[in-house]
Amino acid sequence: MNLRMIITAVWLYERTGLGSTLAWLGLIELAVRIPSNLYGGVFADRLDRKKLIAFTQFFSFFLIGFMALLESSSSLEIWHVYLVSAILSATSVFGNPARSAFTARVVPRNVLSHAVAMNTITWQVGTIVTPFIFYLTSFAWRDTASDSLVLSFWINTLIAFFSVISPFFIRESGKALEITKTTSINKNLIEGFKYVISHPILPGLYILDIGVTVVSYYRELFPIFAKQLYSRGRDAVAILTAFNAIGAIFGSLLVMYTHKIKRKGVIVLYATLVYGFLLIIFGWSTSIWIGIFALIALGAADAVGMTMRQTVVQLTTPDNMRGRATAAHSLAAMSANGIGKWEVAIMSDYIGAGNTMILGGFVSILVVLIIWYALSGVRKYSYQED
């Protein structure tokens, strides 16, 4: 998925030169993510999670291959990219609750934060590798990188094929414990909604995620920052994406040393507060070296906050509700990503990408302070071993 997002973002931005092109892509993705995520959580608690993951990954393989064929014949159009991105956003989000809920089945509770961190590290290793795959296959290393992205599309198709078969190598059963198929799907959905709303911690975590991400989403928008902040092209996109992922790996490794800290909600708040200050640094500087430093630190802070949020969701939710609880978490995150992608891309056309990040940093700090004092459940949460 990382490689697809880089390829399509660069393809769209090079075709139009407008941040709004990526902004509308974010809204299209958001429109399909909401229902897909909600029902993905319900089905993750009813169906075999391994099969559900493989089913959703098949769409990635098929549709990325479809774009590769169109690009090979110079027939790929903007509406094709929008349509395929919408479908793949829906299927990817539909499978997210199954992936998240499955994690808690294969590891003991006392090392769950380690497992979530390793998932994040695996994801970020891919995020490091894929920019360099893009760098090579898009010929960004040439003085004038204007070649077709057809090779990038085909390599992405090959990688997607392996994602279809990989879930079946996991030996643990994919079925949820205490599964209740007798209840209707809509009743399952309502039951999950009521559980999340009444939870003492989860609403605060979700509001925090939404409040910060809506004003600061920068991933998938590196073509804009590369051009506006550093006057660079594909090479800078690959560099910025990779170093942000390196930072995320450092952050995920740091999480492994926090397993003895009981007040995990405080870790989330501090990590998000640091994230806000780093956004200001990233937006303020036009030096790519300072930008790289800021992105490494941003990746680390974001990874700590994200991993701990996911861990708290898993620790405070019974297995037969995890699919729906993680779906609610994904809904908050993915919805914020879509709106944030639109907001940041549009604002970058009007006030500049740097000013947009500075504004986002100040708003993020304000959101953390509001959650700290107004929704104290997050701050007061302390993990207790069974």
Would you name each region that the model predicts?
Residues 1-11, 86, 197-217, 296:
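Pair of pore-lining "gating" transmembrane helices in MFS-fold secondary transporters
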Residues 8, 94-107, 304-317:
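Intracellular juxtamembrane helix-capping segments at the cytosolic ends
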Residues 9-15, 68-73, 129-155, 228-229, ...:
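Transmembrane alpha-helix termini and helix-breaking/packing motifs in multi-pass membrane transporters
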Residues 76-84, 204-205, 289-295:
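Short hydrophobic/alpha-helical segments at membrane-entry points of transmembrane helices
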Residues 85-125:
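Cytoplasmic helix-loop-helix junction between adjacent transmembrane helices
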Residues 101, 105, 147-149, 153-183, ...:
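Helix-loop junctions on the cytosolic side of multi-pass membrane transporters
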